[in-house]
Amino acid sequence: MSCTIYDKTKPITLQTRMDNYVKTTFLQHALRIILGSFMVLAAIGHLTFQREEFQAQVPTWIPLSKDLVVLLSGIVEFALGIGMLFWRKRRVLVGIALGVFFILIFPGNVAQYTNSIDAFGLDTDRARLIRLFFQPVLVLWALWSTGAVKAFKQRSTL
């Protein structure tokens, strides 16, 4: 990823700032491993035994087959999970990508709530509504555990 950001007097590249190693704490590391493992497990569910439940969450306005959407999102989840677990050099970019992914799949959670779809143990409107509020937590978890928040702060001080 390479784009130029102009900071009043001199250009800096986003690539240089985001790809540099950002030191994280033990807690961030542990939570990144947990989230990466969760993503790999979710991907396995998408690709195998939970495919039908995930298909039920795909909004009807998406112009692709529900099965294709579930398979593609499972592949993306697997790649992001592996990236969270092993791609240290690009950890910040993987965290940003995972945060964006969580935002992109949010309409599926909204569809589950608005259409009262029972899946993954969410069998009441209250449970489905609470799940909606968990999505921002996942976005922040991805960004914080990978050091992306710190990288953004460092970038803003230039």
Residue ranges and their predicted role:
Residues 2-158:
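Membrane-interface extramembranous regions
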